[in-house]
C-alpha cells in the first residue's frame, strides 16, 4: 500500500540516484586540450596577400565565382531538386544549383559581390541574406524591399560584405511553401 512515508522514501532515493548518475556522467567528459606547444596553435597568417584560408563546406561544394571589374560574380539558379535521403527514398525539394541545401558562397570582409539569381521554380521567389549588412533593396523581401523574381527571370543582388561571419540565405517569397520545400 502506498502511503506518504513510502512515497517520500521512494522519491528521495530516486533523486539521490539521479544526482549520483549526473556526477558520474560529468566525470566521463574529457578535458579541453591546453595549448602548450606551437603545434596546437592556430596557423599564422600568410606573409603576403589577404589573410585568408578557404573553408571546408559541409556539403562539399563552394559556388564558383569570377572576378569582373573588382566584383566577385556568382550565379545561383533556384530550381526543383530530387534528393535521395536514403537508398530508394527520394524527396522532391527546391534548392539552388541542383542541390539542397544550396552551395556555400565564399567571400571575405570587404569583397564586393554581384549574385545573379535565376528563377526556375514554378512560382516567383527572392533570396534573403540572413544577418548581412546590406542596402534595403538587396534584402530579398519581395514586394517590400525588392520585386519578386518571376519564373524564368534573373535578378541581380549587389552589395559589399561589411563584416565577416557565417550567414545563411533562403527564399523570402511564399515562405511556408518555399522553405518547406528545402
Model regions and ranges:
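N-terminal secretory signal peptides and thylakoid transit peptides that target proteins
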Residues: 1-15
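Intrinsic-disorder/low-complexity regions
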Residues: 2-5, 47, 110
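Histidine- and aromatic-enriched segments that form or immediately flank copper-ligand environments
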Residues: 73-182
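Generic recognition of flexible, low-complexity loop/linker segments
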Residues: 15, 62-63, 102-103
Amino acid at each position: 500500500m502506498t502511503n506518504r512515508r513510502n512515497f517520500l522514501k521512494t522519491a528521495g532515493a530516486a533523486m539521490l540516484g539521479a544526482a549520483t548518475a549526473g556526477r558520474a556522467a560529468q566525470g566521463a567528459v574529457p578535458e579541453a586540450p591546453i595549448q602548450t606547444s606551437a603545434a596546437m596553435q592556430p596557423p599564422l597568417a600568410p606573409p603576403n596577400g589577404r589573410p585568408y584560408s578557404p573553408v571546408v563546406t559541409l556539403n562539399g561544394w563552394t559556388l564558383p565565382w569570377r572576378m569582373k571589374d573588382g566584383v566577385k560574380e556568382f550565379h545561383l539558379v533556384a530550381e526543383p531538386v530530387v534528393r535521395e535521403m536514403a537508398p530508394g527514398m527520394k524527396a522532391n525539394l527546391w534548392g539552388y544549383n541542383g542541390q539542397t541545401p544550396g552551395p556555400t558562397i565564399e567571400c571575405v570582409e570587404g569583397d564586393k559581390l554581384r549574385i545573379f539569381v535565376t528563377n526556375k521554380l514554378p512560382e516567383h521567389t527572392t533570396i534573403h541574406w540572413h544577418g548581412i549588412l546590406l542596402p534595403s533593396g538587396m534584402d530579398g523581401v519581395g514586394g517590400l524591399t525588392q520585386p519578386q523574381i518571376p519564373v524564368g527571370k534573373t535578378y541581380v543582388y549587389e552589395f559589399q560584405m561589411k563584416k565577416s561571419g557565417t550567414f545563411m540565405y533562403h527564399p523570402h517569397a511564399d515562405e511556408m511553401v518555399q522553405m518547406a520545400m528545402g
